[in-house]
C-alpha cells in the first residue's frame, strides 16, 4: 500500500536489488527521490544477488518491509523469479536499465550482451574506480610526480575544492591529481609539458575563498591575523592563478556557485572534448 499524504515527511521503504555493487541503483534512486519533497526513503540495498537462494532472502525482507523495488539484474531466470514474486507480494518493481537497454538494442540492431560479458564489464569498471581513487590519494595536494598517468590535473589556490573534486572524479573512474598554487612558489615543471592529461585551473571569488579559509582557521583554533585570509593578499593569489591559466591556455572553472558534482561534470565534458579532438 502506498504511503498516505501528510504534513510530515512521508517515510517509505525502497529496496534496491543488484547483481553488482548497487551503486548505479543508489544514484538513480536518490536522484529520483530528490524530486519529491517531504519524502524520506528507508533504504535497503542488496548487492551481488546472483542466485535464487540470495533472492529468497531479499524477498523475505521485502515481505517484512513492503515498498518499491528497484533492480538491475541481467540474468533472465532471476529476473522472472523476482518479477513473479513482486506480483504475488503486491509491490511495484522497476527495472531501471530496461528502457535504455531496449532503446540501444533497437538502435544498434543487436541483442543485449550475455551475462558473463556484462559482469566482466561491471567488474572492470569497479576496479578502474578503485585504481582512480588510489591515484587521487597518492597525488593529492601536489604529491607524486607521474602526472602523465593522470586523466586530469587540477590547479588552484587553497580552498578551491581541489581535493573533493579529485575524489569525486575518482569515484567516476577518472585519475585526477591536484596541485596547489602558491604565489611565487613554482609548480612542478612536468606540468607544462603534459600531453595526455587535461589540465584545469580552478578559481573562486575572493569573498568565497576568504570565508572558507576563515572558517577553517576557526575550526583549527589558529591565528586569524595572517595573509591567508587578508582580502588583498587573496585577490593577488587569484590574479596570479588566472594569469598562469591564461598564459598556458588552460581551461578555467569558477567554483564559487558550483557544487562538487557540477564542477566535476564540467571537467568531464572538457576531457571528452579534448579526447574527441585527438581522435
Curated annotation (Swiss-Prot):
Pfam families: Kinase-PPPase (PF03618). It comes from Maricaulis maris (strain MCS10) (Caulobacter maris). The keyword DNA damage does not apply. This is Putative pyruvate, phosphate dikinase regulatory protein. The keyword Kinase applies. InterPro entries: Kinase-pyrophosphorylase, P-loop_NTPase, PPDK_reg. HAMAP family: PDRP. PANTHER family: PYRUVATE, PHOSPHATE DIKINASE REGULATORY PROTEIN 1, CHLOROPLASTIC (PTHR31756:SF3). GO terms for molecular function: ADP binding; ATP binding; phosphotransferase activity, phosphate group as acceptor; protein serine/threonine kinase activity. It catalyses: N(tele)-phospho-L-histidyl/L-threonyl-[pyruvate, phosphate dikinase] + ADP = N(tele)-phospho-L-histidyl/O-phospho-L-threonyl-[pyruvate, phosphate dikinase] + AMP + H(+); N(tele)-phospho-L-histidyl/O-phospho-L-threonyl-[pyruvate, phosphate dikinase] + phosphate + H(+) = N(tele)-phospho-L-histidyl/L-threonyl-[pyruvate, phosphate dikinase] + diphosphate.
